[in-house]
Regions:
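Short, surface-exposed basic-aromatic patches at helix termini and helix-loop junctions that form
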Residues: 41-47, 71, 110-114
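A short acidic (Asp/Glu
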Residues: 32-35, 62-66, 105-107
């Protein structure tokens, strides 16, 4: 299983995905989540989770970042479905964030009309 760049995201696609994990990293390492969180994300992929890791550049406008990473994530899902790389009609989606990524997933779930099976929040940062 190799990382693929799709619509500004880094994606791991197992042969038979059981769920989708949208991963957002911490503020200082968020620009390359496929490298800085490689061990964790590839372990998830090996367990059958389709991983979409969305890089971002940190600014003080966290709602704008949340909107941007959500748009990139949704574009990646659309592209995966259009190219038949994602064949399942429905898979549960989990948001997973570390530090600043936690805050972004909380903003995404609070501000935007999305459906998530749940969020996994690792070391929440409240700045």
């Amino acid at each position: 299983m190799d990382w693929q760049e799709i619509s500004g995201n880094w994606v791991l696609i197992p042969s038979r995905p059981i769920a989708i994990v949208h991963f957002l990293g911490g503020a200082f390492v968020a620009t390359a989540p496929q490298l800085t969180y490689r061990w964790l994300l590839e372990a998830l992929g090996n367990q059958g989770y389709l991983v979409i890791a969305t890089p971002f550049v940190n600014t003080l406008d966290h709602i704008a970042i949340a909107r941007d990473v959500l748009n990139k994530f949704e574009n990646a899902l659309d592209r995966l479905r259009a190219t038949k790389l994602l064949k399942a009609s429905y898979l549960p989606v989990y948001g997973m964030g570390h530090s600043m990524g936690c805050k972004l997933h909380l903003l995404i779930g609070s501000v935007f009309d999305i459906e998530r099976a749940g969020n996994i929040l690792i070391s929440f940062n409240n700045y």
